[in-house]
Amino acid sequence: MATFLTNVVSIKPTIFSFQSESFTPLHTRVNVFSSKPFPSLAGTFSRSSRTRFIPYAVTETEEKPAALDPSSEAARRVYIGNIPRTVTNEQLTKLVEEHGAVEKVQVMYDKYSGRSRRFGFATMKSVEDANAVVEKLNGNTVEGREIKVNITEKPIASSPDLSVLQSEDSAFVDSPYKVYVGNLAKTVTKEMLENLFSEKGKVVSAKVSRVPGTSKSTGFGFVTFSSEEDVEAAIVALNNSLLEGQKIRVNKA
């Protein structure tokens, strides 16, 4: 007889061996995602060995996300952007610890090229220290570059928040001095484009194109500059260069 289940997430048959007096679980499981009746496997033996399938069901449970604790790491974590590529973890730590107690600092590097991605994070020991770092360092110049410093406010998600991406798109400043950037890796953000292209000229704005209504990258973007000279310099220097492990295409938009 078929058996019906309610709110079943998966059916996980577990194989037990009857070769000894005690059952020995072999840990073979099969996930079944279906609301339809499933045939009972109990009492089924294979011909080659005395193996029995004993199905059991796992019911669904809901977990509510915990509210962000002001003292959590996310509230104490500071984003530091537009830093020179030469800045190391040690140098960034020295810069930050002048304004508060530091728990850890990490400069982010491209996993393929090994080059700095021009930004990093500093986790402070208190929210007050994190706020002090933002107040004292945001807008400061480090080796000729104006750095951007702000509280991350929430843990870095595996996929960007859609409302944030839509806001970024609406904030894009168009210009006749614009380049198209193609063959972008799915992980590339507008900040990465800004950091990369600012090496070759004054970047006005940048954006990564997204599939409408989603956070999924379409694999291309745009960068605007303040002059035609900057456009030409960016194309010559960055066309076919590596970004997040992929060769990008750069040409006039």
Curated annotation (Swiss-Prot):
Transit peptide range per the UniProt entry: 1-56
Keywords assigned by UniProt, alphabetized: Chaperone, Chloroplast, DNA-binding, Plastid, Repeat, Ribonucleoprotein, Ribosomal protein, RNA-binding, rRNA-binding, Stress response, Transit peptide
Gene null: resulting phenotype: No detectable effects on ribosome biogenesis and translation in normal conditions. Better seedling growth under salt stress conditions.
One example of a Gene Ontology biological process annotation: negative regulation of response to salt stress
Gene3D superfamilies: 3.30.70.330
SUPFAM superfamilies per UniProt: RNA-binding domain, RBD (SSF54928)
Main location: plastid
Domain RRM: 76-154, 177-253
Magnesium in keyword set: no
UniProt xrefs under InterPro entries: Euk_RNA-bind_prot (IPR050502), Nucleotide-bd_a/b_plait_sf (IPR012677), RBD_domain_sf (IPR035979), RRM_dom (IPR000504)
GO cellular component assignments: chloroplast; chloroplast envelope; chloroplast stroma; chloroplast thylakoid membrane; cytosol; ribonucleoprotein complex; ribosome; thylakoid
Highest taxon, organism lineage: Eukaryota
Cellular localization per UniProt: Plastid, Chloroplast
Coiled-coil blocks: none
Expression induction or repression: Down-regulated under cold, salt and dehydration stress conditions.
Role, per record: Component of the chloroplast ribosome (chloro-ribosome), a dedicated translation machinery responsible for the synthesis of chloroplast genome-encoded proteins, including proteins of the transcription and translation machinery and components of the photosynthetic apparatus. May have a role in the recruitment of stored chloroplast mRNAs for active protein synthesis. Bind single strand DNA (ssDNA) and RNA in vitro. Exhibits RNA chaperone activity. Negatively regulates resistance responses to abiotic stresses during seed germination (e.g.
Summary of subunit composition and partner proteins: Component of the chloroplast small ribosomal subunit (SSU). Mature 70S chloroplast ribosomes of higher plants consist of a small (30S) and a large (50S) subunit. The 30S small subunit contains 1 molecule of ribosomal RNA (16S rRNA) and 24 different proteins. The 50S large subunit contains 3 rRNA molecules (23S, 5S and 4.5S rRNA) and 33 different proteins.
Name of the molecule in the record: Small ribosomal subunit protein cS22
Gene source species: Arabidopsis thaliana (Mouse-ear cress)
Gene: PSRP2
